[in-house]
């Protein structure tokens, strides 16, 4: 007897990838995620490859993982994939201190974010 298999978190024609601790604010990552929402997966990879935003590097890695999951784990057609969902949220925040004059210090906040990308296979029209 083994443990029952957990139900899928996405639909049958969908694949998921999550980047959990991406160094940077959720606001900056959401700007990059907005560039690829609803686009074809191949076009989204090109947009991220030529984007000047620093967060595009990490977003491209998560998208590449979602495409690989679709191809290898769920046997979906890579050419028919569309970025169905690209949601961003906050993760941890590292706290650091910066020493200042007269024996004082100030707090530095170093935010991390999460990126969840779902790709869906669509029929060519």
From Swiss-Prot:
SUPFAM superfamilies named in the record: Ribosomal protein L22
CDD domains the UniProt entry points to: Ribosomal_L22
Keyword flag Ribonucleoprotein: yes
Pfam families: Ribosomal_L22
GO biological process terms held by the UniProt record: translation
Entry keyword set: Ribonucleoprotein, Ribosomal protein, RNA-binding, rRNA-binding
GO cellular component: cytosolic large ribosomal subunit
GO MF, one annotated term: structural constituent of ribosome
Record-linked Gene3D superfamilies: Ribosomal protein L22/L17
PANTHER family: CHLOROPLAST 50S RIBOSOMAL PROTEIN L22-RELATED, LARGE RIBOSOMAL SUBUNIT PROTEIN UL22M
Record-stated family: Belongs to the universal ribosomal protein uL22 family.
Subunit structure: Part of the 50S ribosomal subunit.
Protein purpose: This protein binds specifically to 23S rRNA; its binding is stimulated by other ribosomal proteins, e.g. L4, L17, and L20. It is important during the early stages of 50S assembly. It makes multiple contacts with different domains of the 23S rRNA in the assembled 50S subunit and ribosome.
Protein name per Swiss-Prot or TrEMBL: Large ribosomal subunit protein uL22
Taxonomy of the source species: Bacteria, Pseudomonadati, Pseudomonadota, Alphaproteobacteria, Sphingomonadales
Gene name for this UniProt entry: rplV
